[in-house]
Amino acid sequence: MDEQSVRRTDEDVEAFIANSADPGALRTLDAAIRSAIPGISRTLWRGVFWGGTEQAIIGYGDITQPRPRGPAVEWFLIGLAQQQRHLSLNINAADEGRYLSQHYAERLGRVKVGAASIAFRSPDLLDLGVLDEMLHHAARVQPPDQPRG
């Protein structure tokens, strides 16, 4: 993750969701995130992500993310994106040395879990109760920064 390659924008998140390929799916997940962490900030991020792909991601909660090499970067606690064939959530929080996506992988439903990422075809395949539990956990172990003024 190069801090120059993916940046927050001032684009309207609601308009982005409304114009997406599957606004219903994004609205379901957006509501779940905002319900679990009331008052969390939402920002649309755009840029070239890992692997060289151009992406747009709704970022929830501002955090300062340490990196193994180089300075820490401004990032988001939760990321939500619609890919070509699936949806993805990035949970940028860890507990006991493991990303929370790995802690909850077995209980999340029909998903594919990477280090911090969770991929699935539809919110119907995701256990929203377990997602809610994981989001609460994320806010406890990696509290988002105060909203920007």
Task: Pin down the residues of each PLM region.
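Charge-dense, helix-prone N-terminal extensions
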Residues: 1-149
